[in-house]
């Protein structure tokens, strides 16, 4: 197979134009072309308003050797092997009990998917509801403010990413093919095929919800089981020559209002970044963990049209997608300020999961067609900023900010104009930017939520961003808070076997501190499944 890299095409090109360009580049006739597939696609707007698509394309031809002799171009590679991923089952150790996966976010879901596909018959435990009921619970919360502690934006089938922009890009280095396998599985279960080649793939909360459901059906059809409303509240261990080994899980069924014990040889803790009670429980059992740096800040909203013109030029074609952006700044105080989880044509959402605490996030539907662009603007914080060196001190740091946000908005999302934020005064009216928020909101002084070093860093960072995207620091840009769940505040220590010191416990995904975002969490879930399959033979149910 031949790969053509860095091929620029006019933004309005047709598929026929595309094929003609391939034929010309490879100096072949149409009958010599057997097929082609887009490998990567991105938009080049560096010379706006002149815009291009930039492609990498994999091409099959009748006689590759002939083309190789004829064409001399350093952007063309020959004898490319197709992407392939291989899940190897080589474990010999017998499982006494079915493997258990705690959490059905991307890490848990993909771990369960791979184990089910290869005969391990996993049990997936999810404290929240299935995605259909969860959606109803979340929409009810946004409408009336009554929070369901186990079925909300953070907890339930699909994890926190279900109510997000559904971004699928990752910066994780991947020589094993896990990244492409994640995208392939998503596409196989209902996501658009374009996610496999777009430079910044996303599917939106509406499509992601449907894909998650189809993946669950696959798991169940291949011998797996998914138990909703099932929260792990405790573990039981036994000792073997001084080594703690997992023996049982204590599970609370919130629908039946009853507790039961589940025997298991191993449990994958893919619990997500908001499972603070589970972090605490594991700490009480002596599972090694450490605080880690993360970032906190606000959501900021601008008109999407302003962002489109900044990115594409004033007279951009209407068929282009809502434009994204990514901005960073290093401040004189040594801290970094950057945008995170930018949602073109999206919504700010009340993403709370604890009583009397309030957190926000960003979300987009697949069409990305709201009038506003929003992003988190966040400031790095490290364990040095926490009040103690306790492993869970970062959790308490988050909680204090969320409590302040709840009080500032009287239980609603506190909202402020950026100009008022700079002047440290509460907003009393909106400007030309109307908030697009899922959930009730109230004008307030968002600056009151933060320590001064965070507030000053946010102000300085946003003003720097204005030099990169004109209008970014406009006085009527709408900010809301608090963006506190950007990543896990703790890392659950695991060794090369991916287990903790309590053998049989596999910390996994974003909550455990080993991923950041949907795709990297899914990849870590696959990696954990691979490790289990390298030790254990597929589960055999006793007849």
List the predicted regions and their residue ranges:
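Residues forming the flavin
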Residues: 1-53, 57-163, 167-543
């Amino acid at each position: 197979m031949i790969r053509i890299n860095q091929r620029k095409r006019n933004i309005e090109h047709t598929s026929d134009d595309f094929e003609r360009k391939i034929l010309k580049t490879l100096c072949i006739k149409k009958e010599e072309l057997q097929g082609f597939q887009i490998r990567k696609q991105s938009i080049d707007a560096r010379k706006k308003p002149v815009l291009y698509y930039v492609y990498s394309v994999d091409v099959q031809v009748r006689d590759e050797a002939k083309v190789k002799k004829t064409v001399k171009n350093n952007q063309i590679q020959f004898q490319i092997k197709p992407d392939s991923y291989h899940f190897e089952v080589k474990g010999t150790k017998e499982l006494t009990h079915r493997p258990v996966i705690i959490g059905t976010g991307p890490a848990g879901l993909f771990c369960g998917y791979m184990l089910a596909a290869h005969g391990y018959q996993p049990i997936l435990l999810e404290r929240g509801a299935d995605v259909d009921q969860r959606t109803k619970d979340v929409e009810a919360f946004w409408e009336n403010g009554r929070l369901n502690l186990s079925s909300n934006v953070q907890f339930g089938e699909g994890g926190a990413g279900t109510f997000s922009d559904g971004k699928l890009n990752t910066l994780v280095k991947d020589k094993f093919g896990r990244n492409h396998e994640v995208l392939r599985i998503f596409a196989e279960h209902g996501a658009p095929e374009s996610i496999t080649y777009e430079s910044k793939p996303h599917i939106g909360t509406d499509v992601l919800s449907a894909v998650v459901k189809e993946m669950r059906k696959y798991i169940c059809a291949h011998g797996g089981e998914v138990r909703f409303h099932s929260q792990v509240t405790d573990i039981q261990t036994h000792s073997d020559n001084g080594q703690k080994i997992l023996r049982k899980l204590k599970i609370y069924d919130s629908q039946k209002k009853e507790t039961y014990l589940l025997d298991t040889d191993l449990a994958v803790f893919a619990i997500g970044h908001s499972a603070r009670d589970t972090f605490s429980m594991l700490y009480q059992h002596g599972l090694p963990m450490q605080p880690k740096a993360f970032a906190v800040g606000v959501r900021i909203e601008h008109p999407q049209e302003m962002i489109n013109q900044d990115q594409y030029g004033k007279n951009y074609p209407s068929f282009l997608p809502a434009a994204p952006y990514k901005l960073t700044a290093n401040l004189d105080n040594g801290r970094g300020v950057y945008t995170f989880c930018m949602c073109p044509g999206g919504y700010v959402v009340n993403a709370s999961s604890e009583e009397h605490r309030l957190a926000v996030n960003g979300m987009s539907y697949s069409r990305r067609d709201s009038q506003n662009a929003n992003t988190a603007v966040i400031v790095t914080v490290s364990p040095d900023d926490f009040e103690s060196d306790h492993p869970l001190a970062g959790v308490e740091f988050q909680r204090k900010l969320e409590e302040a946000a709840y009080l500032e908005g009287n239980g609603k999302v506190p909202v402020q104009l950026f100009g008022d934020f700079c002047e440290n005064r509460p907003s009393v009216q909106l400007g030309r930017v109307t908030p697009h928020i899922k959930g009730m909101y109230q004008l307030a002084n968002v600056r009151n939520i933060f320590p001064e070093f965070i507030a000053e860093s946010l102000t300085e960072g946003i003003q720097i961003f204005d030099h990169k995207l004109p209008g970014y620091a406009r006085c009527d840009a709408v900010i809301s808070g608090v963006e506190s769940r950007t990543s896990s505040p703790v890392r659950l220590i695991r060794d090369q076997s991916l287990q903790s010191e309590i053998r049989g416990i596999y910390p996994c995904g974003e909550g455990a501190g080993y991923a950041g975002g949907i795709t990297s969490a899914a990849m870590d879930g696959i990696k954990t499944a691979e490790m289990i399959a390298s030790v254990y033979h597929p589960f055999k149910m006793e007849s």
